[in-house]
């Protein structure tokens, strides 16, 4: 069984664990990295529960924030927010995420599957991964805006590469590669 839990990233002069936004999970937070420029990574190991809103953390710290919810080291839910550009959600390791959610992916489905899902209505599901998360191209564009608010100039290409990659072998590696491509925590 792989890792389940949150990796929380933000920038502040105080420890993120001391913010009101993370008050509900404060006792379970463990610091993983804290840099001189204020960027921090905190961990909250948990297979359930909710750590709170990244929008709230971004507003409180007046800086971009994001979390990755790692699911069994196979995929990651990514929620990001910045004071000016707002919040967005996507995922890393899309094929594994589709399996967890029981959602198809538009690109990978055969004609019969897509038609069946439409005809089946709610009973057949019919939802795709893009109904839950921004598709990789849109997420890469939002990530560029997020990085700009963090003071970094980045290109969509390297972000898109991470957003369309599969775990190698752990989804956590994708998360930290994504942070590297954002210019936040270089590898």
What name fits each language-model region?
Residues 25-96:
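Short, intrinsically disordered low-complexity segments
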Residues 10-13, 88, 96-99:
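Surface-exposed, low-hydrophobicity interaction/linker segments
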Residues 94-108, 116-187:
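Long, compositionally biased intrinsically disordered terminal regions
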């Amino acid at each position: 069984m792989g890792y389940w839990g949150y990796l929380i990233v933000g920038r502040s002069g105080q420890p993120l664990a001391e913010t009101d936004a993370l008050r509900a999970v404060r006792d379970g937070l463990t610091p993983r990295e804290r840099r001189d420029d204020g960027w921090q990574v905190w961990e909250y190991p948990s297979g359930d529960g909710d750590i709170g809103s990244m929008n709230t953390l971004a507003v409180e710290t007046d800086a971009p924030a994001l979390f990755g919810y790692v699911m069994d080291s196979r995929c990651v839910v990514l929620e990001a927010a910045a004071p000016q550009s707002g919040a967005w959600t996507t995922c890393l390791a899309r094929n594994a995420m589709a399996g967890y959610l029981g959602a198809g992916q538009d690109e990978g489905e055969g004609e019969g599957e897509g038609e069946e899902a439409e005809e089946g209505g709610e009973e057949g599901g019919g939802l795709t991964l893009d109904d839950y998360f921004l598709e990789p191209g849109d997420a890469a564009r939002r990530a560029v805006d997020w990085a700009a608010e963090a003071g970094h100039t980045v290109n969509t290409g390297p972000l898109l590469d991470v957003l369309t990659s599969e775990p190698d072998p752990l989804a956590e590696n994708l998360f930290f590669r994504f942070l590297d491509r954002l210019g936040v925590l270089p590898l």
